[in-house]
């Protein structure tokens, strides 16, 4: 019952296992319901997000497809309008080409007609459909005629909004492209929107797709009669059509409809995918129904568990509780047999074992009680023995107090200076007897020590007198040594200053030698560079001679080739002369043909024509021959000038070779002189370097002497300081000896208050010991 006081549960629950089980089952049911509700909410939210993403992605996919379709149509109409037949052909050729486009299926899907359109008169001049030829498009209400588009250039195109005309019974979208080179002509693709509307609306079961423009009018709708009408979404207060950017997509929902919207990149159209809200979220309702069924099933199962297992468990616990209370009241013969093999069977067995253990413990407790009574009797006897021993201890304590007083008196006498006092060591207690012997031994040792100290004090007084006398003699000698060392230090200092002055002079001499060596080295380097430059110049001159010789040879070959060309031109001139002669003969033949034609009257018309042709060709040939002859003469004249120039160049090259050869000879002479100068400068450089090294060696020797002199001065200064320190130390020793004698006198007067035996003999021994030390 005490454990229930700390339980957070009310007492009526904490005191009943059935109540606890009921509370636990109720809590489990609440947890299951809460988990089911949370799962349902999360599943519904996830499903709604998936549905929104799915519808929006579908609208984006269809927008991309529609974009591609429009781009293809624009590109196709633009390329068709550039065909030569539409820029340069006749109306008949254009009509024939348009019919071929349709019959050969060269048009994009959905194009029902192609028109060659006059933008000024709004007349269709040619068409792939014979019914449209000569039709005034403006009278039919076609927007590309009533409101003609303004093109930025020949590559521009225009897509109209859906429209209907009386000639056809379905909505049309026109794609218009200007004809290059003709501002008043355009090519128009007429596209049937029904097929495209059916294509984009057949992608998903349970949904349909529409296309609206930014004005809110349907461009495409599964119900073709709705094309051109106003879309309901544009009439809402929060119209999303005007807020969409090209390529942007969004999700919109109403009470009954879900919509995914995507605006096209290439045109102001918006693709809208519609899906019924109830059908789209049907899966969410199914999930919620399934979760409710699972929750009810779990609740029923928990109830069955509580009724079956819980009821049986409670009955078993109550029976076991009654038997446990009987055992607690001392009734250990209760029946603990059970046929259960589960945890309750184990618990019955545990209670049976506990009952056996209780019986054993009761038997052991009775045995322990008997043993305690026997121990009590033994304790009484022990107490009597202790009383007898206490009397004996009191007698021993009195004896010990007496001996302690005797020992104390002897120690007090020793403390007062009487070291001859001793104690009696016989005692009832062995330890006290040993203490007495130790006291006597200590007093003997202390008496001997005091005697030795008296003798030692006398010896110290005598030794202090001798030390004082010797210290005075050593002090006089130290002062003399210090004076001599100071004189040595002054001489060494003067010698060091002289060596430093010599070292400075040698330093200047060494620097001058090094500067001369450096200058000589620079001159040597310059001389070597000059020699190398001269050698390079000589090699370059040799190469120049070789190149100029090669140029001279090539010039000779060029002159020979030009002369050969001149000979070839002479031969060509002879051929031109032959051609000129042939032309003159041809002119004669043409003249004869003309005469024959004149004699032949009407029958000679053919001869006259041939004669005129031959004459014309002859004149042209003669002019060409004269031109060739003039060009040959010009080339021959230019070749002659070139030959003269090449010969003059060859002469100059020969003279240049001679000049370069003279330059080579001069460079060789310069190189020889430079090498001789370089040799002399190298010798000067080596001598200067040797002089610099000698100066450095002398400098090193002087530095060594300076160092030795400085060390000597330093050592002399150190020795002088040591002598002064020694003198001071001697004075301190003398003072210490005086102080030591005073303290020895004080010690001797202090030791006189102690009374000892045979002090003379001990003092002699101590004196001898001190003398040995």
Curated annotation (Swiss-Prot):
Biased composition (Polar residues): 724-737
Ranges that cross the membrane: 21-41, 291-311
UniProt KW Transmembrane helix keyword: yes
Positions of the HAMP domain: 311-363, 398-451
GO molecular function: transmembrane signaling receptor activity
Region (Disordered): 717-740
Swiss-Prot/TrEMBL GO biological process terms: chemotaxis; signal transduction
Coiled coil: 727-760
Domain Methyl-accepting transducer: 470-706
PANTHER family found in the cross-reference section: LYSOZYME-LIKE PROTEIN-RELATED, METHYL-ACCEPTING CHEMOTAXIS PROTEIN MCPB
UniProt similarity note: Belongs to the methyl-accepting chemotaxis (MCP) protein family.
Role noted for this protein: Transduces signals from the phototaxis receptor sensory rhodopsin II (Sop2).
Protein name listed in UniProt: Sensory rhodopsin II transducer
Organism: Haloarcula marismortui (strain ATCC 43049 / DSM 3752 / JCM 8966 / VKM B-1809)
Upper taxonomic lineage: Archaea, Methanobacteriati, Methanobacteriota, Stenosarchaea group, Halobacteria
Gene: htr2
């Amino acid at each position: 019952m005490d454990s229930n006081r700390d339980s957070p549960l009310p007492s009526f629950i904490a005191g009943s296992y059935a109540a606890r089980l009921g509370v636990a089952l109720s809590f489990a049911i609440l947890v299951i319901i809460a988990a089911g509700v949370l799962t349902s909410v999360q599943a519904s939210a996830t499903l709604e997000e998936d549905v929104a993403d799915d519808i929006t992605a579908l609208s984006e996919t269809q927008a991309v497809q529609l974009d591609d379709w429009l781009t293809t149509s624009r590109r196709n109409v633009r390329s068709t309008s550039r065909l030569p037949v539409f820029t340069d052909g006749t109306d008949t050729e254009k009509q024939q080409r348009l019919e071929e486009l349709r019959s050969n299926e060269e048009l994009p899907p959905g194009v029902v007609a192609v028109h060659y359109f006059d933008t000024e008169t709004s007349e269709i001049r040619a068409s792939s459909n014979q019914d449209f030829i000569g039709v005034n498009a403006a009278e039919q209400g076609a927007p590309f005629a009533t409101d003609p588009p303004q093109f930025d250039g020949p590559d521009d195109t225009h897509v109209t909004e859906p429209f209907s005309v009386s000639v056809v019974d379905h909505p049309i979208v026109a794609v218009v492209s200007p004809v290059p080179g003709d501002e008043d002509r355009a090519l128009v693709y007429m596209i049937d929107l029904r097929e495209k509307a059916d294509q984009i609306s057949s992608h998903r079961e349970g949904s349909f797709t529409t296309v609206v423009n930014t004005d809110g009018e349907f461009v495409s709708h599964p119900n073709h009669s709705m094309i051109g009408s106003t879309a309901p979404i544009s009439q809402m207060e929060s119209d999303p059509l005007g807020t969409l950017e090209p390529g942007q997509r969004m999700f919109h929902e109403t009470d009954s409809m879900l919509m995914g919207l995507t605006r096209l990149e290439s045109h102001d159209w918006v693709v809208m995918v519609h899906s019924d809200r109830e059908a789209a979220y049907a899966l969410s309702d199914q999930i919620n129904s399934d979760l409710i069924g699972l929750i009810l099933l779990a609740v029923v199962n928990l109830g069955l568990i509580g009724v079956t297992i819980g009821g049986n468990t409670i009955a078993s616990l109550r029976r076991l509780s009654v038997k446990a209370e009987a055992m607690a009241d001392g009734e250990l013969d209760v029946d603990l047999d059970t046929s259960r093999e589960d945890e309750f069977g184990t618990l019955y067995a545990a209670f049976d074992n506990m009952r056996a253990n209780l019986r054993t413990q009761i038997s052991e407790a009775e045995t322990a009680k008997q043993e305690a009574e026997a121990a009590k009797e033994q304790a009484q006897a022990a107490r009597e023995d202790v009383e007898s021993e206490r009397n004996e201890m009191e007698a021993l304590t009195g004896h010990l107090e007496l001996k302690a007083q005797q020992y104390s008196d002897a120690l007090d006498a020793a403390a007062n200076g009487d070291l001859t006092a001793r104690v009696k060591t016989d005692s009832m207690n062995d330890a006290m007897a040993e203490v007495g012997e130790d006291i006597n031994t200590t007093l003997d040792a202390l008496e001997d020590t005091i005697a030795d100290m008296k003798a030692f004090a006398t010896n110290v007084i005598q030794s202090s007198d001798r030390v004082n006398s010797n210290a005075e003699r050593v002090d006089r000698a130290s002062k003399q040594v210090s004076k001599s060392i100071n004189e040595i230090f002054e001489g060494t200092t003067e010698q060091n200053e002289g060596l430093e002055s010599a070292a400075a002079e040698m330093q200047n001499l060494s620097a001058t030698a090094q500067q001369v060596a450096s200058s000589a080295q620079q001159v040597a380097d310059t001389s070597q560079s000059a020699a190398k430059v001269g050698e390079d110049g000589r090699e370059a001159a040799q190469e120049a001679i070789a190149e100029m010789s090669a140029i001279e040879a090539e010039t000779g070959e060029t002159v020979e080739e030009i002369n050969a060309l001149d000979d070839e031109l002479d031969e060509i001139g002879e051929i031109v002369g032959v051609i000129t002669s042939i032309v003159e003969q041809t002119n004669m033949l043409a003249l004869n043909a003309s005469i024959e034609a004149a004699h032949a009257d009407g029958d000679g018309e053919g001869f006259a024509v041939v004669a005129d042709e031959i004459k014309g060709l002859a004149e042209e040939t003669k002019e060409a021959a004269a031109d060739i002859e003039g060009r040959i003469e010009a080339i021959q004249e230019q070749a002659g000038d070139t030959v003269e120039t090449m010969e003059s160049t060859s002469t100059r090259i020969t003279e240049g070779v001679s000049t370069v050869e003279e330059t080579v000879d001069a460079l060789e002479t310069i190189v020889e002189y430079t090498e001789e100068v370089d040799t002399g400068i190298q010798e000067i450089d080596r001598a200067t370097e040797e002089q610099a090294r000698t100066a450095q060696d002398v400098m090193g020797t002087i530095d060594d002497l300076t160092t030795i002199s400085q060390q000597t001065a330093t050592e002399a200064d150190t020795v002088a300081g040591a002598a002064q320190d020694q003198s001071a130390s001697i004075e301190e020793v003398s003072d210490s000896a005086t102080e030591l004698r005073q303290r020895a006198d004080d010690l001797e007067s202090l030791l006189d208050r102690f009374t000892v035996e045979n002090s003379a003999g001990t003092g002699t021994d101590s004196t001898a010991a001190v003398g040995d030390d």
